[in-house]
Amino acid sequence: MEDRQKLEQMVTEINQLQQQGETITQQIEQLNQSLADITTAQEAVKGIKNATGKQTLVPIGAGCFIETELKSEDIIVGVGSDVAIKRSREETEKTLQTDKEEVQKLIGSLTEQLQKINEYIAQKRPEAERLMKETGVQ
């Protein structure tokens, strides 16, 4: 009976860790999307340097663009809760770089956690399989 209880505990623990791993994987995917968005914004901000007074194309979605003349290098930046502020191109570049570094750190940290979880599961799985054979549980 002791082996059976140990097996049940191991299976429960492995299942919980697998769910945690799936959650972390989803978080990493979301952060990778944020990272891609930040990179796209960085490229756009760099692209307007010294472009005041020039014609440019602005994406409006679904592969559509409008042609416009850039009147300023200032950028309207969302700061949360439907609030936006005007920042210089330089300030925006710094903010985006800081945001990018924070997201990269988070991705690194979550990837490390995921790796530890996967290693732990890989370490415990053979013992769980052995106990399954010994107790006759499928």
Swiss-Prot record:
An MF annotation (GO) of this entry: unfolded protein binding
Location(s), subcellular: Cytoplasm
Main location: cytoplasm
Gene Ontology biological-process annotations: protein folding
UniProt keyword terms in alphabetical order: Chaperone, Cytoplasm
Top-level taxonomic group: Archaea
Gene3D superfamilies reported in the protein's UniProt record: 1.10.287.370
Gene Ontology CC: one annotated term: prefoldin complex
InterPro entries membership: PFD_alpha_archaea, Prefoldin, Prefoldin_subunit_alpha
NCBIfam families for the chain: prefoldin subunit alpha (TIGR00293)
Annotated function: Molecular chaperone capable of stabilizing a range of proteins. Seems to fulfill an ATP-independent, HSP70-like function in archaeal de novo protein folding.
Summary of subunit composition and partner proteins: Heterohexamer of two alpha and four beta subunits.
Family to which this protein belongs: Belongs to the prefoldin subunit alpha family.
HAMAP family registered for this protein in UniProt: PfdA
Protein name in UniProt: Prefoldin subunit alpha
